[in-house]
Design a protein with these regions (language model features):
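Short amphipathic C-terminal alpha-helix that caps PH/PH-like domains
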Residues: 124, 227-230
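ATPase catalytic-site recognition across NTP-hydrolyzing enzymes
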Residues: 15-83
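Mg2+-dependent endonuclease catalytic cores in nucleic-acid-processing enzymes, primarily RNase H-like
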Residues: 1-20, 30-34, 51, 55, ...
Length: 249
């Protein structure tokens, strides 16, 4: 017999219960908040969000990510970003904004949007201007080169300082994501959950990052790909240190 299956997560994108009914029946937001607090991320997704994940193949574990509550005092050494652009379809455009302090990179903001190209491009411009990003790298695969050109032109027209460069990647995406993950885990800091409670976009990006698996297919790999680009870009900007020493002879 033919059947129609309806899949509905316990909570919506804003963390509000999808099963909170009148007259005291159903499950309210507090109930699901308590459940999430007492379960690991994989169990929560599988049991309540209809998003089963292959636990053994996860590349990023939310518990092992470095977190922060506020930026260090003082001016950052640099503000950079990298953008995994989107064309048409269901892919997401992802652009983390990193504040560098010494050897650490604080993920202060992130765009994770699958809206129309026009809306996304406008948001990219606004984000680069807001954070006064000095250098940004856009992928030039597919339509990325044209998007980078349009965003750069608009940033300059509005008095921005961002210098956008492009890079075409020939490496296998999954291999690149895996190889760059140690740098992300060691050097990148993400906002604490208490800070992003009402930041739907940041939470969505974290969920996609920690949902990436090496053991099967991924519905969305845009976020881990963007952080791979960030890691590669950050390392490319590190200049060699020259030390003066006494000639031994």
């Amino acid at each position: 017999p033919r059947a129609k299956f309806i899949v509905m997560p316990a909570v919506d994108e804003n963390g509000e219960s999808n099963f909170d009914y009148k007259y005291g029946v159903g499950f309210d937001k507090k109930y699901f908040d308590d459940m999430k607090e007492n379960l690991d991320d994989c169990s929560w997704r599988a049991l309540f969000m209809n998003q089963p994940i292959e636990r053994e193949g996860l590349l990023y574990n939310e518990d092992e990510l470095r977190r922060y509550f506020e930026l260090p005092s003082g001016t950052p050494d640099a503000v950079i970003s990298a953008c995994d652009t989107k064309d048409k379809g269901k892919d997401f455009c992802v652009m983390p904004v990193l504040y560098q302090y010494g050897n650490d990179y604080y993920v202060e903001d992130i765009i994770c949007d699958n809206s129309s190209p026009e809306i996304v491009e406008s948001r990219l411009v606004s984000c680069l201007l807001k954070h006064k990003v000095k250098a940004s790298r856009f992928e030039s695969n597919s339509a990325g080169g044209k998007i980078a050109e349009k965003v750069q032109r608009e940033v300059r027209a509005q008095g921005g300082i961002t210098n956008i460069t492009t890079k075409y990647s020939t490496a296998n995406k999954d291999t690149r994501i895996i190889v760059d993950s140690p740098f992300v885990k060691e050097r990148f800091l993400f906002k604490d959950d208490s800070i992003i409670k009402n930041n739907q976009e940041y939470r969505r990006a974290l969920g996609m990052l920690c949902g990436y698996t090496m053991a099967g297919k991924n519905a969305h790999d845009d976020v881990p790909d963007a952080f791979s680009m960030c890691a590669d870009f950050a390392q490319s900007l590190v200049t060699a240190q020259v030390k003066v020493f006494t000639r031994p002879f």
